């Protein structure tokens, strides 16, 4: 098992699927912290995800269809061409991305490739230079068993419905629920 820590702890057991969330820089209040006692639980993630789904703080550049599609294209390219992972589920929301993948290389390499490419593409579309697009650290969780895997796929693909953006999962254009 690989372990490292920055602001968040990261455990990556070999052969396990990973649920990864990355968000736009500035998409949570600067003082945002999980409630005491919840940092190492799923409750902390849900608290963060609710804040992100509200989309009331910071940039929402992923609402731009060109940028959202670039992120989807990069995710698919990372799987099909670069062979970095097997992509199990994904959704691009207005200010964050959820991805469930089976890594073929270390997760830091995957996030560096995906976030680096999509940041350059998005900043070009937005006419921005020299500013961070993504928050530098990502949230990740290793999947314990098949039941959890299916719950996470359901969670990811229902995220646009839960956020009130669409009525049906297949109506959200930037999701694995739409992919053939």
Language model regions located:
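Short catalytic/metal-binding and nucleic-acid-binding patches
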Residues: 1-180
């Amino acid at each position: 098992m690989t372990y490292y820590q920055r602001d968040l702890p990261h455990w990556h057991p070999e052969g396990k699927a990973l649920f990864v969330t990355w968000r736009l820089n500035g998409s949570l209040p600067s003082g945002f912290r999980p409630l005491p006692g919840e940092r190492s639980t799923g409750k902390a993630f849900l608290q963060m995800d609710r804040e992100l789904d509200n989309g009331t703080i910071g940039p929402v550049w992923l609402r731009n269809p060109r940028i959202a599609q670039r992120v989807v294209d990069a995710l698919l390219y990372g799987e099909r061409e670069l062979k970095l992972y097997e992509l199990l589920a994904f959704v691009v929301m207005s200010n964050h991305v959820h991805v469930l993948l089976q890594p073929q290389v270390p997760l830091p390499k995957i996030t560096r490739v995906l976030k680096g490419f999509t940041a350059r593409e998005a900043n070009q579309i937005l006419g921005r230079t020299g500013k961070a697009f993504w928050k530098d650290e990502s949230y990740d969780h290793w999947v314990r068993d098949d039941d959890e895997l299916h719950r996470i796929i359901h969670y990811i693909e229902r995220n646009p419905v839960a956020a009130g953006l669409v009525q049906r999962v297949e109506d959200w254009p930037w999701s694995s629920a739409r992919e053939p």
